[in-house]
């Protein structure tokens, strides 16, 4: 099984949609143990702002806030339910049969 890294683009605890998105990721991450790492990219802090800028340059536009990047790619620009996130992660962790598969 492939290991994946999730980044939650997060404005801060005052952003209720950001908080909810992080809670969904935190809940789901428990199911995957060492196969999944995740972090909040808090854009109001220097380190998070730098990563936000990297993602913006890589993808040619500002990332949505909140959003979920998996292995550096925008996967969700709205908060998914836990079951939907699990389904996408399960597919992403399997050996790829079709490199053009979209989620």
What feature does the model see in each segment?
Residues 6, 38-40:
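Generic structural signal for residues in well-ordered beta-strands
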């Amino acid at each position: 099984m492939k290991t994946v890294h999730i980044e939650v683009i997060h404005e801060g605890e005052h952003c209720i949609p950001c908080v909810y998105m992080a809670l969904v990721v935190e809940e789901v991450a428990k199911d995957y143990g060492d196969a999944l790492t995740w972090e909040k990219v808090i854009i109001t802090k220097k380190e998070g702002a730098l990563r936000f800028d990297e993602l913006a340059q890589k993808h040619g536009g500002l990332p949505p806030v909140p959003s979920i990047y998996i292995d550096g790619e925008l996967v969700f620009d709205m908060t998914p339910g836990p079951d939907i996130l699990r389904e996408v992660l399960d597919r992403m962790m399997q050996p790829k049969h079709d490199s053009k598969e979209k989620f």
